[in-house]
Amino acid sequence: MIKVVICGAFGRMGTIIGEIISKEQDMQLVGGVDIKEGTFFGVPVVTSDKLADFLSSVQPDVVIDFTVAPAAAQNVPVAARAGCAIILGTTGLTQEQRKGIDAAIREGKVPAVISTNYSIGMNILWTLIRDAARKLSDYDVEVIEAHHRYKKDAPSGTARTILQILQEEIGPREEIYGREGMTERSSEIGVHVIRGGDIVGDHAVMFASNFETVTLSHRAYDRSVFAEGAVRATRWVFGKEPGIYGMKDVLNLS
């Protein structure tokens, strides 16, 4: 039985993940963490300042974090010191926060899966984008992403991963965020961010030449697609050797 604590228990993702785990035969939800205390699918939820003592009490195997960057930067080191495997889906981390998280995972000698998107489809799309970028390196490239009005980080973590892939394959290129006025295109990557309504997540990469346009895209219709991926990663990371993994490891993608 895999015992799980969810940080961000009352959030959109935390609630969906909690519901899924509560129905799994090989998993047990033992607690949650959020900015207010309460109960969550019949288990206690504590505030992050009590996390260390709480983990010592409930002894989870895996801690899942879908919070906000400042909270994750505090939660993950505490979980690593407690010897818990980690699933991190929080986006918007600064380089300094990510370095601190990575160091804590290594010092704690625990396994962790870190991804900006737990959708199986998006992880496959990332591999396709990398392959396309290698073969279409002289094409103009644009990245477009859209999310709900409440999303705090822009561009999204998923879009940042796309940009990282593109820079690795065809960079370095300047990233231009939106355009205004008379602007002649140079060697760059255009980035366009849309926020509105309750858009779950749309991402597209356009490769354009004078003769054709190739567009690779992914649309999530329900947040459950991310939650299911996170639960899959939870099952995978349990018992793994210490180290920092990605969803490509979970899905055995090259």
Curated annotation (Swiss-Prot):
The keyword Cytoplasm applies. Pathway: Amino-acid biosynthesis; L-lysine biosynthesis via DAP pathway; (S)-tetrahydrodipicolinate from L-aspartate: step 4/4. The keyword Lyase does not apply. GO terms for biological process: diaminopimelate biosynthetic process; lysine biosynthetic process via diaminopimelate. The active site is at 147 (proton donor/acceptor), 151 (proton donor). One of its GO terms (molecular function) is 4-hydroxy-tetrahydrodipicolinate reductase. GO terms for cellular component: cytoplasm. It comes from the Archaea. NCBIfam families: dapB. This is 4-hydroxy-tetrahydrodipicolinate reductase. It comes from Methanospirillum hungatei JF-1 (strain ATCC 27890 / DSM 864 / NBRC 100397 / JF-1).
